[in-house]
């Protein structure tokens, strides 16, 4: 029992270290993008908290895999302390950890973040008393609470039974997975709500992460245009616009007023001139900065990172394609959510992770790296595209200039994407997520000189769907991902969409030229007040 406590303590100690790193990262990440001029304490704290909770929930995945793997020895036998009661206790600890974090996520998505968002919307429109702003924010937030309540009610009573097919052992195995997860209505309701949010996270991942996986590495490889060259072009544009304004105004030298068409043209040209002069100030700042010289010095390193990221992106895409193809060919079909027990078509990541787990904690490091890679590529996609509602761009995400409302949107999108990350990792490495590095004993007859003898030996074999139920422990993560077969079917088709969007984004990113050295920092719809936050940290 002492050994069990030691193993459990080791896993949770590493989780604690990951928690500390996540809190530091979330604080730096939010502070990096928030507007210094419009910074608000409550929105900053909310954004940091929401992002940290999402990352912490993703950090539970490797802890779950670590604990089920360390219950068994490499020879396929259970460790002395890992009896049935202890194993169930450890599994339940991880499961309760998931439900605690997921309950907090529901609180953030359906109550806290909407309330803070609407509060600041009201604060901008009405400078009246705080009580009135809080009441209005609560009124709008009530709609989100209603949606949450509906999801919980549906989840509590939605049927979990998968359609019955006779004479199929695969169907029987899939059904056992659903039965093992339990039938508590409260936990089922929570699972349904989280799965619904994960579907939204899947859509966000298809939109932003898939594009960011191609845009981020190619931008690193191509680099940015020269600040001096851009400034020269900008100066020429300023002179051209000034001359056009003078030509139009020269029409009224004899006292005649300008026509309405000419007045509109002058107004548009003057707005264009203001934008160009703002660009001039930004380019002058960046051209004189030491940061530009530093970026030029590390240019070879950025190219190396870009090549590495594009290789990783292609590796992920190939692994995801092979995993989805395996489901299409060997799963029980649509009615089971394309659930597959074991792997028939292996992929690079599914082969690599069990090997790394033998040298603890390399697999933990790789999983953390994968999660962070998804976060960075998602952020790259959001920053390049902005936050859109259909064809309307709501907010732009810019370093040091992001409004409080946009920051809340950003963290909610990242929170939903990270929720979907667990299924993405399962899609990339299904065998690893299901069993980790567990092995079980298989009986084998020993032969001597080609003659079978009555000597029975046992050899260790990697856990798969053919293993006896009492010999291999399925992770709580895997069971949680497949609690509702219809969500699994949605995730399956979402993976194909993810691959398609990545390939389209790769083509678009290849066709685009170099980015401006001040890309996204100066737009025509910006106010001149935004220049109060001039920054040299563009590259």
UniProtKB/Swiss-Prot annotation:
Example GO molecular function: cobalamin binding
Pfam families assigned: LMBR1 (PF04791)
UniProt keyword annotations, A-Z: Cell membrane, Cobalamin, Cobalt, Endoplasmic reticulum, Glycoprotein, Lysosome, Membrane, Transmembrane, Transmembrane helix, Transport
Compartment list: Endoplasmic reticulum membrane; Lysosome membrane; Cell membrane
Cytoplasmic side: 29-47, 119-141, 207-302, 383-405, 505-539
InterPro entries: LMBD1_LysCbl_Transport, LMBR1-like_membr_prot
Keyword Nucleotide-binding among record annotations: no
Domain of life (superkingdom): Eukaryota
Membrane-crossing residue ranges in chain numbering: 8-28, 48-68, 98-118, 142-162, 186-206, 303-323, 362-382, 406-426, 484-504
KW Calcium (keyword) present: no
Family stated for the protein in its record: Belongs to the LIMR family. LMBRD1 subfamily.
The protein's name: Lysosomal cobalamin transport escort protein LMBD1
Primary gene name: LMBRD1
């Amino acid at each position: 029992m002492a050994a069990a406590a030691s193993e459990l303590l080791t896993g949770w100690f590493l989780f604690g270290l990951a928690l500390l790193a996540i809190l530091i990262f979330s604080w730096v990440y939010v502070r990096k993008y928030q507007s210094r001029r419009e910074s608000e304490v409550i929105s900053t704290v909310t954004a940091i908290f929401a992002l940290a909770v999402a990352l912490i929930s993703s950090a539970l995945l490797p802890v779950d895999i670590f604990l089920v793997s360390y219950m068994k020895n490499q020879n396929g036998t259970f460790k002395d302390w890992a009896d049935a009661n202890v194993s169930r206790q450890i599994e339940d600890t991880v499961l309760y950890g998931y439900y605690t974090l997921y309950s907090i996520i529901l609180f953030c998505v359906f109550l806290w973040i909407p309330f803070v968002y609407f509060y600041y919307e009201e604060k901008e429109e009405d400078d009246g008393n705080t009580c009135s702003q809080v009441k209005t924010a609560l009124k709008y937030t009530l709609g989100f609470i209603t949606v949450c309540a509906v999801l919980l009610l549906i989840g509590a009573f939605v049927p979990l039974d998968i359609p019955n097919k006779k004479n199929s052992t695969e169907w029987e195995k899939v059904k056992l997975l659903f039965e093992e997860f339990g039938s508590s209505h409260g936990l089922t309701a929570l699972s349904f709500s989280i799965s619904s949010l994960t579907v939204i996270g899947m859509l966000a991942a298809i939109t932003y992460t898939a594009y960011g996986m191609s845009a981020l590495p190619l931008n690193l490889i191509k680099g940015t245009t020269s600040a001096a060259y851009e400034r020269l072009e900008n100066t020429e544009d300023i002179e051209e616009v000034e001359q056009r304004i003078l030509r139009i105004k020269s029409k009224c030298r004899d006292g005649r007023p300008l026509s309405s068409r000419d007045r509109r043209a002058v107004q548009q040209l003057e707005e264009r001139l203001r934008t160009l002069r703002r660009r001039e100030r930004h380019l002058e700042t960046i051209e004189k900065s030491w940061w530009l010289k530093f970026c030029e010095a590390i240019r070879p390193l950025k190219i190396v990172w870009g090549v590495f990221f594009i290789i990783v992106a292609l590796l992920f895409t190939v692994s995801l394609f092979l995993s989805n193809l395996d489901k299409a060919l060997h799963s029980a079909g649509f009615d089971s959510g394309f659930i597959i027990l074991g792997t028939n078509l292996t992929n690079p990541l599914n082969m690599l992770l069990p090997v790394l787990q033998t040298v603890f904690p390399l697999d933990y490091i790789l999983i953390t790296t994968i999660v962070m890679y998804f976060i960075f590529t998602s952020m790259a996609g959001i920053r390049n595209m902005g936050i859109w509602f259909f064809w309307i761009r709501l907010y732009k995400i810019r370093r040091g200039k992001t409004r409080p409302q946009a920051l809340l949107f950003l963290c909610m999108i990242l929170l939903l994407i990270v929720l979907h990350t667990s299924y993405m990792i399962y899609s990339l490495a299904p065998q690893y997520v299901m069993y980790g590095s567990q092995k079980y004993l298989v009986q084998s007859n020993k032969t001597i000189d080609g003659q079978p003898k009555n000597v029975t030996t046992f050899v260790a074999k990697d856990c798969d769907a053919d293993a006896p139920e009492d010999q291999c422990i399925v992770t709580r993560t895997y069971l949680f991902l497949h609690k509702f077969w219809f969500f699994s079917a949605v995730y399956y088709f979402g993976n194909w969409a993810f691959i398609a969007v990545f390939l389209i984004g790769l083509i678009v990113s290849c066709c685009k030229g170099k980015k401006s050295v001040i890309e996204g920092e100066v737009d025509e719809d910006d106010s001149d007040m935004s220049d109060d936050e001039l920054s040299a940290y563009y590259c």
